[in-house]
Regions:
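ATP-binding N-terminal substructure of ATP-dependent carboxylate-amine bond-forming enzymes
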Residues: 1-147, 151-152, 156-158, 162, ...
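Hydrophobic beta-strand scaffold residues
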Residues: 40, 145-146, 174, 200, ...
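Phosphate-binding site of ATP-dependent enzymes
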Residues: 217-302, 323-337
């Protein structure tokens, strides 16, 4: 009897500094997915960007200790060939690399082997080369359905500068900020404080998980923060500190997105840094649901969906915002201010995205099921749109009509 299960490629790892976070998220997705409905193929991306066919038991064994989690050695390399009938093929095993053998060494090379066709890809990737539109573009070229926002939504949300400008133009409040395009052009500490007040957050424009983010309270802090941020990106944001509560909302859907109940992050560190998120088990208290009145809860959910739509998101995203407890420039106390939108949020044991949906009545396996169905529905919708092939046929028909007249 043929296997009727949907075949899902779980794509994880990657080149970004958030590699380990991706591995932790992938472990949870792999363990939670309904095996009666889905047949999974593990595709690991190493730190050099190479794709590998990963063995599930080996990966889960290496992932059992979060302090030593790593992508295990995999002998089979993979390549994706784009087109309307995409193929994932195995290539020369890793053991041949570095052997000194040339392409014409005379030794017979193994023929590429094609893997069974995948129905959908679940990218469990974080940061650059994962959630910034690059992988999404490759999968779109291959006509492979994939979970999460498309190329535009992924790219826009990854770039904090572009995202904030689009949100601001849509009438959605964001923290006052300055964009710096090179270390040499950075304003002095006094100039930055005059524009934004102190303390100031310094952030790489295109990183996630608070990687490279610093809070500057003095000139010395500021100079170190700039050096650190520019080591991760060529564009850096200087951002005014919003004094308030950190609220997070999970959003799910395509044309008609839904918002979860709000949760709250109460950091025990100076801010919710990478260390607080992933290295210190006591780095923050996660409060679900957030202690908000009904009116504020409704406002928060509404602005989360507005932001999701304004930044062209589909599938899923986690919307991070502040509930201001003090006035911030023109924004009064009580304002809801968007911090950022994470298009491929974490799925680790402490991650808010699945936790918020679980508290909203959507279990982890059901959430994965809905995300996969949304990916397939979107791909089917997009495939119905007119293509260059379709337009060529229309053009030829019109040309024939014009000639016959």
């Amino acid at each position: 009897m043929a296997d009727s299960r949907v075949r899902v490629g779980v794509l994880f790892g990657g080149e970004s500094p958030e590699h380990e976070v991706s591995l932790r998220s992938a472990k949870n997705v792999i363990e939670a997915i309904d095996r009666e409905r889905y047949d999974i193929v593990l595709i690991g991306i190493d730190r050099r960007g190479r794709w590998h066919l990963a063995d599930e038991s080996s990966f889960l064994r290496h992932a059992s200790d979060p302090r030593r989690i790593r992508l295990p050695h995999a002998p089979v390399r993979l390549a994706l060939t784009p087109g309307r009938r995409p193929r994932i093929v195995s290539v020369v095993p890793q053991s041949r690399e570095g052997s000194g053998e040339s392409e014409d060494s005379g030794e017979e090379r193994p023929e590429p082997a094609e893997l069974p066709e995948l129905d959908v890809i679940f990218p469990v990737l974080h940061g650059p080369f994962g959630e910034d539109g690059t992988v999404q573009g490759l999968l779109r070229l291959a006509h492979l359905p994939f979970v999460g926002p498309g190329i535009l939504g992924s790219a826009v949300c990854m770039d904090k500068d572009v995202a904030k400008r689009l949100l601001r133009d849509a009438g959605i409040p964001v923290a006052p900020f300055i964009t710096v395009l090179s270390r040499a052009e950075a304003p002095s500490w006094d100039e930055a404080v005059a524009a934004l007040d102190a303390p100031i957050f310094v952030k790489p424009a295109n990183m996630g998980s608070s990687v490279g983010v610093s809070k500057a309270e003095t000139d010395a802090d500021y100079q170190r923060a700039l050096d650190g941020a520019f080591s991760f990106d060529t564009k850096v944001l200087l951002e005014r500190t919003i004094r308030g509560r950190e609220i997070e909302i999970s959003v799910l859907g395509n044309e008609t997105p839904e918002a979860s109940i709000p949760g709250e992050i109460a950091p025990t560190h100076a801010f919710y840094s990478y260390e607080a998120k992933y290295l210190d088990h006591d780095g923050a208290d996660l409060l679900i649901p957030a202690d908000l009145d009904a009116e504020t809860t409704a406002r928060a959910r509404e602005v989360a969906v507005r932001a999701f739509r304004a930044l062209c998101c589909e599938g899923m995203a986690r919307v991070d915002l502040f509930l201001a407890t003090e006035p911030c420039g023109p924004l009064p106390s009580g304002s809801l201010v968007i911090n950022e939108i994470n298009t491929l949020p974490g799925f680790t044991r402490i991650s808010m995205y699945p936790k918020l949906w679980d508290a909203s009545g959507v279990s982890y396996p059901e959430l994965i099921d809905r995300l996969i169905r949304l990916a397939i529905e979107r791909a089917e919708r997009d495939e119905r749109l007119a293509s260059a092939i379709d337009l060529q046929g229309v053009g030829e028909a019109n040309h024939g009509e014009a000639g016959s007249g």
